[in-house]
């Protein structure tokens, strides 16, 4: 068969099918136009080969329901729906709100925070704070020993007599006391500062390890601590004394200085030459902290006494 005849037959067949094919294209184009109006633009913008899920439908305003189901009601977006889990934040008021004066307002008469300031603008806005029951009832240790306090007006202890809120008759106590003897002592009543009426100093504190003298037989009077160094201060003789060595130490009638070199005697010096003296002073050797004062401590300086020996050593040296 000739190729030209085959070509002509194919061309004739194509001309016969062209009107039907054109009608199909026109009808298809009309269907596409009508269907594009009924489908939302958000759905048409997706790829044709991708399935649409209900989760992705939240981003658009309308989602086509699956076959056999009624259309769903439109749901508001996440930016329009109020979140029930996040309650509205309410400003919390501090317990110290308006309990102190505003420093900026007190100095310049104005404050940039205005009504939102946490401090009081004048005595009219000042509130009473809830304080501890012991607030301003004890003396400030740092203020009376160092002359200043890092907390200033916010300190909970007393700085001035006008701040005293303690009950009348209640002694003022320092949190940290220092013993006059230089030894650590417990909590005790301190001498009141100027402007306070408190109990006067009546005794000197001793270390718990040392044996204190009997009541009323303290060899030092309270005035000895307030006297200037080098000024002779009178002293009453204690009776009775605890041992003969202490009795000999109380013979001078004056002391030189408030704390004129309290020295502890060696064990060899505290022993006497007679048996009675040896027996009486033996009790003082039981503890190393018993206060035994020398005869020249409270009086004028005296030449050192020659070292004494026990009677048994004297007899040994004589026999040799």
Curated annotation (Swiss-Prot):
Residues 66-85, 300-309 have a biased composition (Pro residues). This is mRNA decay activator protein ZFP36. Residues 1-167, 93-320 are annotated as: Necessary for localization of ARE-containing mRNAs to processing bodies (PBs). It is found in: Nucleus; Cytoplasm; Cytoplasmic granule; Cytoplasm, P-body. The modification Phosphoserine is found at residues 53, 59, 81, 83, 86, 179, 190, 211, 221, 270, 290, 317. One of its GO terms (biological process) is cellular response to fibroblast growth factor stimulus. Keywords: Cytoplasm, Developmental protein, DNA-binding, Exosome, Metal-binding, mRNA transport, Nucleus, Phosphoprotein, Repeat, Ribonucleoprotein, Transport, Ubl conjugation, Zinc, Zinc-finger. P-P-P-P-G repeats lie at residues 64-68, 191-195, 212-216. The modification Phosphothreonine is found at residues 85, 251. Residues 27-50 have a biased composition (Polar residues). Residues 306-320 are annotated as: Interaction with CNOT1. Phosphorylated. Phosphorylation at serine and/or threonine residues occurs in a p38 MAPK- and MAPKAPK2-dependent manner. Phosphorylated by MAPKAPK2 at Ser-53 and Ser-179; phosphorylation increases its stability and cytoplasmic localization, promotes binding to 14-3-3 adapter proteins and inhibits the recruitment of cytoplasmic CCR4-NOT and PAN2-PAN3 deadenylase complexes to the mRNA decay machinery, thereby inhibiting ZFP36-induced ARE-containing mRNA deadenylation and decay processes. Phosphorylation by MAPKAPK2 does not impair ARE-containing RNA-binding. Ubiquitinated; pyruvate kinase (PKM)-dependent ubiquitination leads to proteasomal degradation through a p38 MAPK signaling pathway. Transmembrane segments: none annotated. Residues 167-320 are annotated as: Necessary for mRNA decay activation. The keyword Mitochondrion does not apply. Residues 1-93 are annotated as: Necessary and sufficient for the association with mRNA decay enzymes and mRNA decay activation. Residues 1-15 are annotated as: Necessary for nuclear export. Its main location: nucleus. It comes from the Eukaryota. SUPFAM superfamilies: CCCH zinc finger. Residues 88-161 are annotated as: Necessary for nuclear localization. The C3H1-type zinc finger domains are necessary for ARE-binding activity. Residues 86-95, 197-209, 280-290 have a biased composition (Low complexity).
């Amino acid at each position: 068969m000739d190729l030209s005849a085959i070509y002509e037959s194919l061309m004739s067949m194509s001309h016969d099918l062209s009107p039907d094919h054109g009608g199909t294209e026109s009808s298809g184009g009309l269907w596409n136009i009508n269907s594009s109006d009924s489908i939302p633009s958000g759905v048409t913008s997706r790829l044709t080969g991708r399935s649409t899920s209900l989760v992705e439908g939240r981003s658009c305003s309308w989602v086509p329901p699956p076959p056999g189901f009624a259309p769903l009601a439109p749901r508001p977006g996440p930016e329009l729906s109020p979140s029930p889990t996040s309650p509205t934040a309410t400003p919390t008021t501090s317990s110290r709100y308006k309990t102190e004066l505003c420093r900026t307002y007190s100095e310049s008469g104005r404050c940039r925070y205005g009504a939102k300031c946490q401090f009081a603008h004048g005595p009219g806005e000042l509130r009473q704070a809830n304080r501890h029951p012991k607030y301003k009832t004890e003396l400030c240790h740092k203020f009376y020993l160092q002359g200043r306090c890092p907390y200033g007006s916010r300190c909970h202890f007393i700085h001035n007599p006008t701040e005293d809120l303690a009950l009348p008759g209640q002694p003022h106590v320092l949190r940290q006391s220092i013993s006059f003897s230089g030894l650590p002592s417990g909590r005790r009543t301190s001498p009141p500062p100027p402007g306070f009426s408190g109990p006067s100093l009546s005794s000197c504190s001793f270390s718990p390890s040392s044996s204190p003298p009997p009541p009323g037989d303290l060899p030092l009077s309270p005035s000895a601590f307030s006297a200037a160094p080098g000024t002779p201060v009178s002293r009453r003789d204690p009776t009775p004394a605890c041992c003969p060595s202490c009795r000999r130490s109380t013979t001078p009638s004056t002391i030189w200085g408030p704390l004129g070199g309290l020295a502890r005697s060696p064990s060899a010096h505290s022993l006497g030459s007679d048996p009675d003296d040896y027996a009486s002073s033996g009790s003082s050797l039981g503890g190393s902290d018993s206060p035994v004062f020398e005869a020249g401590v409270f009086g004028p300086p005296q030449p050192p006494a020659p070292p004494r020996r026990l009677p048994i050593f004297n007899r040994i040296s004589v026999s040799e």
